[in-house]
Amino acid sequence: MSRGAAAALPYVRRRAPGGGSPCGAGGAPGPGGPRSGGGDGSHATCPQGDGSHAKCPRGAPIGAPSGHNGRVSTTSLPSPDHAAELRSALLAAGFTADGLLDLLGAPAYAALARSETVPALRATRGAGDAPLAVLVRLFLLQQSVPYAHAEAALPVGVALADGWLLREGESVRATVDVRPYAGPDADADAGDGTGGDWFVVSDLGCAVGGAGGIGGRGREPGTEVVLGVGGASTTLAGITVPLPVGSALDLGTGSGLQALHAAQHATRVTATDVNPRALEFTRLTLALSGAPDAELLTGSLFDPVGDATYDLIVSNPPFVISPGARLTYRDGGMGGDDLCRTLVQEAGAHLNPGGYAQFLGNWQHVEGEDWHDRVRSWVPRGCDAWIVQRDVQDVTQYAELWLRDAGDHHSDPAEYARRYEAWLDEFEARKTRSVGFGWITLRRTDAAEPSIVVEEWPHSVEQPLGGTVLAHFARQDYLRRHDDASLLEGYFLLAHEVVQEQVGTPGAEDPEHVVLRQNRGMRRATKVDTVGAGFAGVCDGSLSAGRILDAIAQLVQEDPVVLRDRTPEAIRMLVEQGFLEPVAHPEG
């Protein structure tokens, strides 16, 4: 199978040609946004493909069998006591992200991301009772398999005793979903020489998300479902800064994906959730992935950690703006976007100096109010911020999205209409016209003049973006330290991923316009004039900005003083957006 084909599939370590993003973390080539299961815009309902797009709801359970009855584990959860032995068996059978791709092939693997399992069932049927095929049927397709076949694939006695499997006569079935996963930092060592071959453990039928098709059937009353890996969670993992840190907090951990990533570069990891079952699933995810244990605390928002501070805080919170807290995994129990606001406002007090907090969120677009101002007002004192809106939905689209997620579109038409009305009543009462989706990153700086960038970027991006986030704040530091005069004394390098495009009539002496375009990261594009294009093209770090402008002034026969006076703003923009990188003086 070609590496290019692999790039369109979720949860696979293989990279596209040219060092593309790991699949499932989001990336090129589709136009970018929060919630797809595919890493490159390949999700059937997501034109953007980084997991944050509004049209890719949590309610698209990957791998839940067609016609699945929505059964969720009702027995006590498995014990992690022999997780290392089970992990060894799974890896020996090739039950990894890449192994799945090799077994199923690209079409069947991609179909799982669309909740279509027939192609995968056919593929495993052809593999007979091979251990990998048996494990796929057990843990991904959630089929009962003959005891003898399971015995050949894994230590079935241990799996039964510890509660991973349940025996039914001469067959066994899985009690939880176990999903191979390889994320943005999957090249990290898991401690056993297997690199980033990880496993995320969640409730059956909930590998990616949503209550649609679950509806509480097969669950004890009051049992809260715990979802597995979804587009939103892989997006957050992809934008998280890749820094070695002393302490990390995964707030609202769910099945533990962010805690698993944090464990690769944090000395100490704390994970919290209001749902005690989620913490048990996190324990299983960490153990089965060969990751260190985390501190697991029950409670809402920052309540469980008191006044503790961290170097890194991450959260994929229950941010859905809904008329009631029906589903804990998505509804935070606060009105409107108050949960996201509270999370952002309180995060600053829990960050160590230089620490980062990164969240996904929703925010209301309220009549008579600029949404930029709304979310900017959330930023706590002492923090820089970068807030990126990736998508917007009007209130009808938003309501329909989450009604489908909850499976309400399968309910009685009158009940569906009643619930739809409740959503619209809620939005009308709050004067909400639409809802934005996006990313929020804070950095604790205690600067006198904080940098707060709030922007809309609904276009294609290439994950992972953690390094891009770090570079953004480094550039903000540079610009904060340099006024226009010192900017002209600086040295710059055209970023290696930037290309120049010229558009104009064939045969014309000059182009109508020139565009600088990034082919990696945020994939920004900006129109520049001939001076800007010439300036950027000459920036190789050997000449100061002022000397370059003086040379250009001679070429275009312009007063160098005038050119120096009007150009710093353009240089500042090119630096801020990552087209130019500040470098040290070539002579030190």
What residues fall within each predicted segment?
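Flexible, glycine-/basic-rich loop-and-beta segments that form/coincide
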Residues: 395-473
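Conserved Class I SAM-dependent methyltransferase catalytic core
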Residues: 274-275, 336-389
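Acidic, low-complexity/disordered tracts enriched in E/D and polar residues
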Residues: 68, 73-134, 179, 183, ...
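Mobile active-site "lid"/loop adjacent to the S-adenosyl-L-methionine
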Residues: 276, 317-342
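Conserved SAM/SAH cofactor-binding pocket of Class I
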Residues: 222, 230-315, 321
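SAM-dependent Rossmann-like transferase core, predominantly class I methyltransferases
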Residues: 168-248, 253-261
